[in-house]
């Protein structure tokens, strides 16, 4: 079941990953993530990379 939240983009084009999403998505401070934009679906995806 998808988890959805609405977030606001800051003036520096930053967004905060909402708590509901973080609970389902094992990301922590310092992790590297890859942001992917799918032009066909107009969807942004986040992929966790190996920690440095």
From Swiss-Prot:
PROSITE patterns: SPOVT_ABRB (PS51740). It comes from the Archaea. SMART domains: SpoVT_AbrB (SM00966). Pfam families: MazE_antitoxin (PF04014). One of its GO terms (molecular function) is DNA binding. Keywords: DNA-binding. Residues 4-51 form the SpoVT-AbrB domain. The keyword Aminoacyl-tRNA synthetase does not apply. PANTHER family: REPRESSOR-LIKE PROTEIN SSO7C3 (PTHR34860:SF6). This is Repressor-like protein SSo7c3. It comes from Saccharolobus solfataricus (strain ATCC 35092 / DSM 1617 / JCM 11322 / P2). The lineage of its organism: Archaea, Thermoproteota, Thermoprotei, Sulfolobales, Sulfolobaceae.
């Amino acid at each position: 079941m998808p988890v959805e939240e609405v977030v606001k983009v800051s003036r520096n084009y930053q967004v905060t990953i909402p708590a509901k999403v973080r609970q389902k998505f094992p990301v922590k401070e310092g992790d590297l993530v890859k942001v992917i934009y799918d032009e066909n679906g107009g969807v942004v995806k986040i992929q966790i990379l190996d920690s440095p």
